[in-house]
Amino acid sequence: MLRVFGHGTVGGAFPLPILTVNVLGSFLMGVFVVAAAHRGLTHLSPLVMTGLLGGFTTFSAFSLETVTLYERGDVGQAALYVALSVGLSIAGLMAGLWLARGVFA
């Protein structure tokens, strides 16, 4: 997935590809939670949420990119990246829940 969006900060600029993947993964997790509950498929939650979506999102890459920015002296960008990653991932999850609840209502 990261090949589609490019590379992160290791030798580059702001880690937008990793941020995008993490927010998208959170959105998909929100959709899955509601869809699985609606369809009676909650038994698949560990497989999909931990396995599939856990492998899709990139928390270890998020950590590396944050430390790389910090060690490069880009403390402001590191703080912005952490704030955007956490805030937008939570917003993405909430948007997925909202969308799926609208579909399955």
Swiss-Prot record:
Signal sequence bounds: none
Query: Sorted alphabetically, which keywords does the UniProt record give?
Result: Cell inner membrane, Cell membrane, Ion channel, Ion transport, Membrane, Metal-binding, Sodium, Transmembrane, Transmembrane helix, Transport
Please give the chief subcellular localization of this protein: membrane
* Membrane-crossing segments per the record: 14-34, 44-64, 79-99
State a single Gene Ontology molecular function. fluoride channel activity
Catalytic reactions on record: fluoride(in) = fluoride(out)
Can you supply one Gene Ontology CC term for this chain's record? plasma membrane
Topology with respect to the bilayer? Multi-pass membrane protein
Activity regulation info: Na(+) is not transported, but it plays an essential structural role and its presence is essential for fluoride channel function.
Specify which residues bind Na(+) according to the UniProt entry for this protein.
G54, T57
Query: Where is the protein situated, by its record's location annotation?
Result: Cell inner membrane
List the InterPro entries.
FluC
Q: Which GO terms describe its biological process?
A: cellular detoxification of fluoride
Its family? Belongs to the fluoride channel Fluc/FEX (TC 1.A.43) family.
Function description: Fluoride-specific ion channel. Important for reducing fluoride concentration in the cell, thus reducing its toxicity.
- Name the chain's protein: Fluoride-specific ion channel FluC
Q: What is the protein's species of origin?
A: Jannaschia sp. (strain CCS1)
Q: Which gene encodes it?
A: fluC
